[in-house]
Amino acid sequence: MKVRPSVKPICEKCKIIKRKGRVMVICENPRHKQKQG
């Protein structure tokens, strides 16, 4: 899980979702998981 000020999809399988008011990227590739903040 990477924590970044700006989250962007890295590949075509990355999905941007909102959980508990936080923007997150979830993906099949665990290296692409990101959290904003």
UniProtKB/Swiss-Prot annotation:
GO cellular component: cytoplasm; ribonucleoprotein complex; ribosome
Domain of life, per lineage: Bacteria
Gene Ontology molecular function: structural constituent of ribosome
InterPro entries, per database record: Ribosomal_bL36, Ribosomal_bL36_sp
Coiled-coil stretches noted in the UniProt entry, renumbered to this chain: none
One Gene Ontology term from the biological process aspect of the record: translation
Nucleus keyword on record: no
Similarity comment: Belongs to the bacterial ribosomal protein bL36 family.
Protein name, UniProt field: Large ribosomal subunit protein bL36
Organism encoding this protein: Clostridium kluyveri (strain ATCC 8527 / DSM 555 / NBRC 12016 / NCIMB 10680 / K1)
Upper classification of the organism: Bacteria, Bacillati, Bacillota, Clostridia, Eubacteriales
